[in-house]
Amino acid sequence: MKEWIIYRYGGGHWARNIRSTEHYFRPGLTWPRRTQGGLSLRAMPAGCIFADKGPAAFVLGDDSDELLALLALANSRSFGLLVSLQMAFGSYEVGVIQRTPVPSLTVTQRKELANLARRAWSLKRTADSVTETSHAFVLPAALRAPRDCDHSLALKVEIDEIHAAIDAIAFDLYGFAEADREAVNGPVMDDEEVETEEDDEDVEAEVPSTDGLLSWAVGVAFGCFDLRIATGERPLPPEPEPFDPLPTKAPGMLPDGAEPFHAHEAILVDEQGHPHDLVHLVEEVLGRVKAPVPDEVRRWLRKEFFAFHLKLYSKSRRKAPIYWPLATASGSYALWLYYPSLSSQTLYTAINDFIAPKL
């Protein structure tokens, strides 16, 4: 990376553009520097690198309880108000966060705030377990038990209660009078009052239940996701701690070395009757988990899936689809390539095993 920086910026020492490397890979807190969603600090696991648009804050000794207590305080209304007094809404520079006072905590206060933050983190992680692109992904929402729909509402209610408990503690720590508390708890600024600026944070749209289910089934067919999680044949790993290094794979993904649902050479095909027919495999996956098979899966795969997939796997200007379609102009015949398994032999296999026999 240092060599790339020197090349990219026309020589000179790499330290001109890579700063504070002694803090790389430490656990800490991070936040988007510019966002119209309001100040929102979150846990930054060990093993990460911060940057200009995603700065970081640390504590001496990297103590997890101290970090969690700071996380709770920094997301309180009191802290947010003190930040807003120093600069415009939507812009959260490092210097402003650094200058905002943090009250001294007793051991009891630190533990109480840390427990609240840890519980909120766990609830948020549970909510992310139905998001395919999350490192916490387990299963799509459509495969959760009916009671989980009520559970998701309960998660939101409990998170709101945790925010209220943190706010109450923070008000006391900062010495807010009752009248000041009522003012801080007043209505939030309307969207029309917020100036439009460049936003460093992407907001994920909710995925339709059926599309999410079909996308997961495609992933199982390609060997991306593990069918055994849905059937109960494989137990889930225990929940990590907030500052544990991120896993190389989400819990719902197929572990390295495990037998995939369908053996293939990184290529599946849209061709009825073919042993590697993607549509047949998707329908077989849904049958194994006793999920209803939607009508016109083949039409959905041809007309809608890639646009849906590309949007799901895009962030800002970076597009990173993992399933690549190679189709005829009419779209009546297509090969689907699985990017993580591509090799120097993939195109030869596509031509010799799939295309040549059709000529």
Regions found by a protein language model. Give the residues of each.
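Polyanion-binding catalytic cores of nucleic-acid enzymes and NTP/SAM-utilizing transferases
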Residues: M1-L60, A114, T126, D148-S152, ...
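Extended amphipathic alpha-helical segments enriched in small hydrophobics
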Residues: V96-F171
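Short acidic (Asp/Glu) and glycine-rich catalytic loops that position anionic groups and cofactors
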Residues: G47-D52, E93-Q98, A141-D150, E193-E198
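Secondary-structure capping and boundary motifs in well-ordered enzyme cores
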Residues: H23, A46-I49, D62, E66, ...
